[in-house]
């Protein structure tokens, strides 16, 4: 069984764990509707994606 030869310092432990943090999702403003949406996702209000109609718009 593998056993560490040296104790891992708090600095090294923290550097290893720095990649585990949850990042807030990014949002962009839609050019057509002005609504906030995730990048590379369909705008659910208008049903548009990359200038094409891919879904029927939601009725509000």
From Swiss-Prot:
Any one of the GO CC terms: large ribosomal subunit
Entry's Gene Ontology molecular function annotations: structural constituent of ribosome
Gene3D superfamilies found in the cross-reference section: Single helix bin (1.20.5.640)
Compositionally biased residues, Basic residues: 1-16
Annotated TM spans: none
Keywords: Ribonucleoprotein, Ribosomal protein
Domain of life of the source: Bacteria
GO biological process, one term: translation
Residues covered by region (Disordered): 1-60
Ion transport recorded as keyword: no
SUPFAM superfamilies associated with the record: Zn-binding ribosomal proteins
Family: Belongs to the bacterial ribosomal protein bL32 family.
Protein name: Large ribosomal subunit protein bL32
Origin species: Mesorhizobium japonicum (strain LMG 29417 / CECT 9101 / MAFF 303099)
Designated gene of the protein: rpmF
């Amino acid at each position: 069984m593998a056993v560490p030869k040296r104790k891992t310092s708090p600095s090294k432990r923290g550097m290893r764990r720095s990649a585990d943090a949850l990042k807030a999702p990014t949002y962009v403003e839609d050019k057509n509707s002005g609504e906030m949406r995730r990048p590379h996702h369909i705008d659910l209000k208008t049903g548009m994606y990359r200038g094409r109609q891919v879904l029927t718009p939601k009725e509000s």
